[in-house]
């Protein structure tokens, strides 16, 4: 029997509708709409598409998107100057720096210059530290989006074994913290993990964020599992797939996210929700 689909498009649409109503309410009360600064350095095709989608999503819910498109040769010093201006601006509630950055710019340095209360990506050490201490405020968008998906479908991780494949600062590490916060027993696997198959086979929840296709063989999967595929890869024919072979996996597991249409839409709506949360906090 094919797996049940975890539909990120449907759930993100519901959350966007709710968010739009909240934004409209605050505007009707005489408050300005939340403002999100979206900074793009260079013209990497994938980044251009991601930024365009984020700006369209802002427009859809009534959040004001402030665009800053900078040339690829922009220096780290100039970017920090812009961030400092945005940190001080009363019109900006959230700052998003589209990653990856050009090689001459240090991502960690840039992230650390964003005010934690405007760090709507949730990457600042302060925000990650709060998550680790079980007192989160602005949380990384992809892991939180995944948790919201699981909650909607009543897929409870408490007392279950969750295996996270990938240990990036953006997904894998904060994902493990979210799962711990929700009461899961968590195993993190990465490029140095030996006997990866063994860990995959014993997972109740499998979150795959390797950034590479087919690291996880579909014959490792089991019928009771919930599989969350964070990967996104464009194939030569223009189609998009995830880290896992969906057509094979959907016949083997209990629940699975499609790619596209699973995690991606939830990441964007969570970014918008973080911006709204930041705006509310800054007005206090």
Swiss-Prot record:
It catalyses: (6R)-5,10-methylene-5,6,7,8-tetrahydrofolate + NADP(+) = (6R)-5,10-methenyltetrahydrofolate + NADPH; (6R)-5,10-methenyltetrahydrofolate + H2O = (6R)-10-formyltetrahydrofolate + H(+). NADP(+) binds at residues 166-168. Coiled coil: none annotated. GO terms for cellular component: cytosol. Pathway: One-carbon metabolism; tetrahydrofolate interconversion. Pfam families: THF_DHG_CYH, THF_DHG_CYH_C. Keywords: Amino-acid biosynthesis, Histidine biosynthesis, Hydrolase, Methionine biosynthesis, Multifunctional enzyme, NADP, One-carbon metabolism, Oxidoreductase, Purine biosynthesis. GO terms for molecular function: methenyltetrahydrofolate cyclohydrolase activity; methylenetetrahydrofolate dehydrogenase (NADP+) activity. PROSITE patterns: THF_DHG_CYH_1, THF_DHG_CYH_2. Its EC number is 1.5.1.5, 3.5.4.9. GO terms for biological process: L-histidine biosynthetic process; methionine biosynthetic process; purine nucleotide biosynthetic process; tetrahydrofolate interconversion. Belongs to the tetrahydrofolate dehydrogenase/cyclohydrolase family. Homodimer. HAMAP family: THF_DHG_CYH. Catalyzes the oxidation of 5,10-methylenetetrahydrofolate to 5,10-methenyltetrahydrofolate and then the hydrolysis of 5,10-methenyltetrahydrofolate to 10-formyltetrahydrofolate. PANTHER family: C-1-TETRAHYDROFOLATE SYNTHASE, CYTOPLASMIC (PTHR48099:SF5), C-1-TETRAHYDROFOLATE SYNTHASE, CYTOPLASMIC-RELATED (PTHR48099). This is Bifunctional protein FolD. It comes from Legionella pneumophila (strain Corby).
């Amino acid at each position: 029997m094919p797996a049940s689909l975890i539909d990120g498009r449907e759930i993100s649409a519901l959350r966007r509708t709710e968010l739009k109503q909240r934004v409209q309410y605050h505007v009707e009360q005489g408050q300005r709409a939340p403002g999100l600064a979206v900074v793009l350095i260079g013209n990497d095709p994938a980044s251009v598409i991601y930024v365009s989608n984020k700006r369209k999503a802002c427009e859809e819910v009534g959040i004001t998107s402030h665009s800053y498109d900078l040339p690829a040769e922009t220096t780290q010093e100039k970017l920090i100057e812009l961030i400092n201006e945005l940190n001080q601006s009363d019109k900006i509630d959230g700052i998003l720096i589209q990653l990856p950055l050009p090689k001459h710019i240090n991502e960690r340095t840039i992230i650390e210059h964003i005010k934690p209360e405007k760090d709507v990506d949730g990457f600042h050490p302060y925000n990650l530290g709060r998550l680790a201490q079980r007192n989160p405020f602005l949380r990384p968008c992809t892991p939180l989006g995944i948790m919201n998906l699981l909650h909607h479908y009543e897929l409870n991780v408490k007392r279950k074994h969750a295996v996270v494949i990938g240990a990036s600062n953006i997904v894998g590490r904060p994902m493990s913290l979210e799962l711990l916060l929700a009461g899961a027993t968590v195993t993190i696997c990465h490029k140095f993990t030996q006997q990866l198959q063994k860990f995959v086979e014993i997972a109740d929840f499998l979150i795959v964020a390797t950034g590479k296709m087919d690291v996880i063989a579909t014959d490792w999967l089991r019928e009771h599992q919930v599989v969350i595929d964070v990967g996104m890869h464009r194939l030569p024919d223009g189609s998009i797939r995830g880290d896992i072979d969906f057509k094979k996996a959907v016949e083997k597991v209990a629940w699975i996210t499609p790619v596209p249409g699973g995690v991606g839409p939830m990441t964007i709506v969570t970014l918008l929700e973080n911006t709204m949360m930041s705006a509310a906090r800054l007005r206090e």
